[in-house]
Amino acid sequence: MREVQAIIFDLDDTLWEVGPVIVRAEHAMLEFLAGRYPRVLELHTLDSMRDLRARMAIEHPAMRHDFTWLRLESLRRHAREAGYPESMAQEAFAVFYRVRNEVTLYDDAVPALERLHARFRLFAISNGNADLAAIGLARFFEHALAARDAGMLKPDPRIFGLLLQRAGLGPERVVHVGDDVIADVEGARRAGVTPVWLNRAGEQWPTAAPPPLTVGSLTELPDLLG
């Protein structure tokens, strides 16, 4: 590997665990709807609301990369169905999104970012819709690219190419750090970027492809990258 100039980070499940965050955010949204727009919950459960979003991603493949649009549009449908104004959707989403950005960072996230920020240009690519400024991490990153803004999801190599183009970088001196074998490791490889698999659980490499550079903690990155 040539001397590294820049590091791209995945966000969800790399810098924080995302599953519990989404659960808390959805329950906060349900509590809001119960108080302000109760007819929605007379018609739907959390599971049926999730099912609608999944169906919408199938019905609107051109928008499947935009989790914000899918959630807002499904909420608009719920509003119309329950006889409420569509403005309900934006109100409910605002509640969801506030809690969605109240993440609990992994213990190694800030120490690693502080060390790496002093030596490398740092970027982020995420399929999710987290707000680094709201989370308090924007100071570390030169640029963050979300799938909803890029128009595509990882592992599409074009999302990596778009970030590299904006950063004025070639792929050969860039590494991408993430937890997902397909979205992060295979996506980076397809873009010509060196992947680093963040394997916190110590799992076996699950595919027939050669295993990538691997770390069990973000604090291993400074030594790995030299």
Show which residues each predicted segment covers:
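Asp-based, Mg2+/Mn2+-dependent phosphohydrolase catalytic module
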Residues: 1-7, 19-20, 86-87, 110-114, ...
